[in-house]
Design a protein with these regions (language model features):
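Sec-dependent N-terminal signal peptides
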Residues: 4-12
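Noncatalytic scaffold domains of N-terminal-nucleophile
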Residues: 17-38, 50-175
Length: 175
């Protein structure tokens, strides 16, 4: 009996500690950084759509949360337009243009130790910037220019922003 009471007590405390759901009527922006989320909200208020906001948030996160996002990586986008069109975009990194199928093999078709990890050719070409701009070009509202999407991230980079407790701890760890 006490075993089940303890389990119910633990589960009820976990549920009680969960944040309450939040609902929005005209749009909502959620990201890993409040500054980036505010950028997305401002884009929506200026007449942008969800893609405009997502692109602006993506660039802002490259500044405010570079450990989890960044211009040197890639990603995917899965979305639904206001007309109900479902689309996906692949923004992942790509192999360099001069890549060849056997570029990490020697003349005997044996793997060259370390070359696939520690050579210029082993690095992928980032896809984030191109992907975000393509998403905006293909599915943006047309009401917001690229300059308006990039300016908030540039301002965050130039003027700075308050770090979260977690970010401050991470930076202090590497002091």
């Amino acid at each position: 009996m006490y075993k089940y009471t303890l389990i119910i007590f633990i589960l009820s405390n976990l549920y009680a500690a969960s944040p309450s759901p939040v609902f929005g009527e005209n749009g909502m922006v959620v990201s890993s950084n409040i500054n980036a989320s505010k950028v997305g909200i401002s884009i929506l208020k200026k007449g942008g759509n969800a893609i405009d906001a997502a692109v602006a948030v993506g660039f802002a996160l490259a500044v405010t949360d570079p450990g989890n996002t960044g211009l040197g990586g890639g990603g995917f986008m899965v979305s639904v337009t206001s007309e109900g069109e479902i689309f996906t975009q692949d923004h992942r990194e790509k192999a360099p243009a001069n890549s060849k199928q056997n570029m990490f093999l020697d003349e005997n078709n044996n793997v060259v130790e370390g070359q696939s990890l520690h050579s210029r050719s082993s690095s992928g070409v980032p896809g984030t910037v191109d992907g975000l701009i393509n998403a905006w070009t293909d599915y943006g509202s047309g009401n917001i220019g690229l300059h308006q999407l990039l300016t908030p991230a540039i301002k965050l980079a130039e003027k700075g922003y308050e770090l979260s407790h977690t970010q401050a701890n991470e930076l202090n760890y590497f002091k």
